[in-house]
A protein has these predicted regions:
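DEDD superfamily 3′-5′ metal-dependent exonuclease/proofreading module
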Residues: 1-13, 20-25, 35-329
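Short beta-strand scaffold segments in enzyme catalytic cores
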Residues: 30-32
Length: 329
């Protein structure tokens, strides 16, 4: 709901641990970003020793109790299960009951192909949107840094540990503009679409985003070119001229005329010589249609094909493209 999405109800978090198994490792750092007094606040809880885990968990529970929406990046796979086991171990109630969770990794995964990403690490998405970190370490590499800090107390090592976590949680907040791209196939953007034609006769759909796109890129498919800039999306669609076949679903009500290679309704076909007609079948109960056709990337109830059998690559008329654009990209 809109109330849930208000900044005051949102909490972004990330954890750092000494290993992947909650049984053989411990939580050493938990970072969170939240909105308070009209500003975003970053807070961290650091464990100098394993015995301080419980205090960190209690502090996180207290903060989360005031929020309704919990953001994390791939936390469904690691952060949340890890913390759940820790809360159980310390006989503490789970803090996220009644709190909705949004995993940005799962929500943004469809962007991997569009943005030409090899991996879907948070850093990969950040780099694609022009964000670059000071932190040079991975979470795994920081385990040794943490151990060295415990032995030496070197404040520089502590800064390295805190910087990595800080950029993780603040990075999630900076990735939120990517939702403007995701809404192309999950939201209703038709009200922002204008339709024109190029000199060559190509259909040109222009989408003015409600919020600016955080990236610019171009993607080409057969017959289609997609161009995205911060202020506009342009979809240029090249039609294919030719003859297609429109298939009728109620083929039992039709006769097939072999010479014409198309079907006519029995109410009319009754006047055709019996030697020039036959009962229609699902594969020949059709009518030839001449015109310009636009590409179709999923099967519709409207059956148009350049072949005498149904195919998912069939074309469909221009009026259908606006209904399907958000699902095709």
């Amino acid at each position: 709901t809109l109330e849930e999405l208000s900044p005051e109800n949102c909490l972004f978090f990330d954890i750092e641990t000494t290993g992947l198994s909650w049984k053989t490792s411990h939580l050493y750092l938990l970072g969170a970003v939240f909105y308070e007094n009209e500003t975003w606040i970053h807070r961290q809880w650091f464990c100098q020793k394993p015995g301080e885990e419980k205090e960190v968990l209690l502090a996180f529970s207290e903060l989360l109790s005031t929020k309704k929406l919990l953001f994390h990046y791939n936390g469904t796979t690691f952060d949340v299960p890890y913390l759940m086991h820790k809360y159980t171990f310390y006989q503490l109630p789970a803090p996220w009951e009644g709190t909705r969770q949004l995993d940005l990794y799962q929500l943004f995964f469809p962007l991997k192909k569009i943005l030409h990403l090899k991996h879907m690490r948070q850093k990969d998405l950040e780099n694609a949107t022009g964000l670059f970190r000071e932190d040079l370490y991975s979470g795994g590499e920081l385990i040794e840094v943490y151990k060295k800090y415990l032995l030496s107390g070197d404040e520089h090592l502590l800064e390295i540990l805190c910087l990595h976590n800080k950029e993780d949680v603040e990075g999630m907040l900076k990735l939120l503009p990517l939702f403007s791209i995701r809404t192309l196939w999950t939201g209703n953007c038709q009200e922002f679409i204008t339709c024109t034609h190029t000199v060559e006769g190509n259909l040109l759909l222009s989408v003015q985003p409600e919020h600016p796109f955080p990236v610019s890129f171009e993607k080409k498919l057969p017959h289609v070119v997609l161009r995205i800039t911060p202020q506009k999306l342009l979809l240029e669609i090249r039609p294919e001229a030719g003859c297609k076949k429109f298939f009728y679903s109620n083929y039992k009500d039709y006769y097939y005329l072999p010479i014409e290679d198309e079907a006519i309704h029995k109410s009319v076909g009754a006047y055709v010589d019996k030697d020039h007609r036959e009962k229609a079948t699902p594969d020949n109960c059709c009518k030839k249609v001449n015109g310009c056709f636009y590409p179709q990337y999923e099967e519709l109830s409207l059956r148009l094909s350049g072949m005498s059998v149904r195919k998912k690559t069939a074309g469909f008329f221009c009026r259908k493209i606006l209904m399907k654009i958000r699902n095709n990209f």
